[in-house]
């Protein structure tokens, strides 16, 4: 499988290493600032890389969004987070002519976490819910795309909920329709997500801990291996 990388930061450098270990080939890179140290051919547009079978994106909206406006039919695996509503809208339009896979978190374990959450929320309807995520000190967006995804799952299952991002100005007691959302940044934390269900005299916490960023790179490669055999459409872990 010939792979075009969109973005060449820490994550796509891991994708390159792991993909080559699996026998795939990196045939090009698109990055905001071309670098002489990049060991692959560098392009400005997706359509310029004729040899690619698929593109894997770990970048940001500033780089990705203009590329999505171009004319091409290359399958895309998208891991960019930020500006989610706009991103989904653009990807759904694009998916009418080419296969597109999107996940805010490329870990299959996080996908399993969402499935567990779909079962837990109805069972624990009287419990308050608080969401917490922790990442390294270089992550610029907060809350994480994964935490937003977890909140969206809860929103589909509980009526009239609202997110609360900061309680220091609140002077009234917590209501049941609030979902607390908390972000921690520090050190080299790869990624931690906790869902706290707090009831009367008992709590339940469901957690996911990423121990290496390799899980995200391998998840993207695995998605690409399947996506290149798919018809045009919008794919997630639920239907790939």
Curated annotation (Swiss-Prot):
The keyword Cell wall biogenesis/degradation does not apply. Pathway: Amino-acid biosynthesis; L-lysine biosynthesis via DAP pathway; (S)-tetrahydrodipicolinate from L-aspartate: step 4/4. One of its GO terms (cellular component) is cytosol. The active site is at 135 (proton donor/acceptor), 139 (proton donor). (S)-2,3,4,5-tetrahydrodipicolinate binds at residues 136, 145-146. NAD(+) binds at residues 79-81, 103-106. It is an enzyme of class 1 (oxidoreductase). SUPFAM superfamilies: Glyceraldehyde-3-phosphate dehydrogenase-like, C-terminal domain (SSF55347), NAD(P)-binding Rossmann-fold domains (SSF51735). It is found in: Cytoplasm. Its EC number is 1.17.1.8. Keywords: Amino-acid biosynthesis, Cytoplasm, Diaminopimelate biosynthesis, Lysine biosynthesis, NAD, NADP, Oxidoreductase. PROSITE patterns: DAPB. Pfam families: DapB_C, DapB_N. Gene3D superfamilies: Dihydrodipicolinate Reductase, domain 2 (3.30.360.10), NAD(P)-binding Rossmann-like Domain (3.40.50.720). The keyword NAD applies. One of its GO terms (biological process) is diaminopimelate biosynthetic process. It catalyses: (S)-2,3,4,5-tetrahydrodipicolinate + NAD(+) + H2O = (2S,4S)-4-hydroxy-2,3,4,5-tetrahydrodipicolinate + NADH + H(+); (S)-2,3,4,5-tetrahydrodipicolinate + NADP(+) + H2O = (2S,4S)-4-hydroxy-2,3,4,5-tetrahydrodipicolinate + NADPH + H(+). GO terms for molecular function: 4-hydroxy-tetrahydrodipicolinate reductase; NAD binding; NADP binding; oxidoreductase activity, acting on CH or CH2 groups, NAD or NADP as acceptor. Its main location: cytoplasm. Belongs to the DapB family. NCBIfam families: dapB (TIGR00036). Catalyzes the conversion of 4-hydroxy-tetrahydrodipicolinate (HTPA) to tetrahydrodipicolinate. This is 4-hydroxy-tetrahydrodipicolinate reductase.
């Amino acid at each position: 499988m010939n792979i075009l990388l969109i973005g060449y930061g820490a994550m796509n450098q891991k994708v390159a290493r792991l993909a080559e270990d699996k026998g795939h080939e990196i045939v090009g890179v698109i990055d905001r600032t071309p670098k002489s140290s990049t060991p692959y051919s560098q392009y400005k547009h997706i359509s310029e890389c004729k040899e690619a079978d698929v593109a894997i994106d770990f970048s940001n909206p500033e780089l990705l969004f203009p590329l999505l406006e171009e004319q091409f039919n290359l399958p895309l695996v998208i891991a960019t987070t930020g500006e989610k509503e706009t991103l989904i809208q653009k990807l759904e339009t694009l998916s009418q002519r080419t296969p597109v896979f999107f996940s805010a978190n490329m870990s299959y374990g996080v996908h399993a976490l969402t499935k567990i959450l779909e079962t837990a929320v109805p069972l624990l309807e009287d419990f308050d819910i608080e969401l917490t995520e922790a990442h390294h000190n270089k992550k610029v967006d907060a809350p994480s795309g994964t935490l937003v995804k977890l909140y969206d799952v809860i929103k589909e299952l509980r009526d009239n909920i609202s997110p609360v991002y900061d309680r220091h100005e609140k002077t009234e007691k917590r209501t049941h329709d609030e979902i607390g959302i908390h972000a921690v940044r520090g050190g080299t934390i790869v990624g931690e997500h906790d869902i706290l269900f707090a009831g009367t005299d008992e709590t339940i916490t469901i957690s996911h801990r990423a121990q290496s960023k390799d899980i995200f790179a391998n998840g993207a490669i695995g998605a690409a291996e399947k996506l290149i055999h798919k018809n045009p459409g919008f794919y997630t872990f639920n239907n790939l």
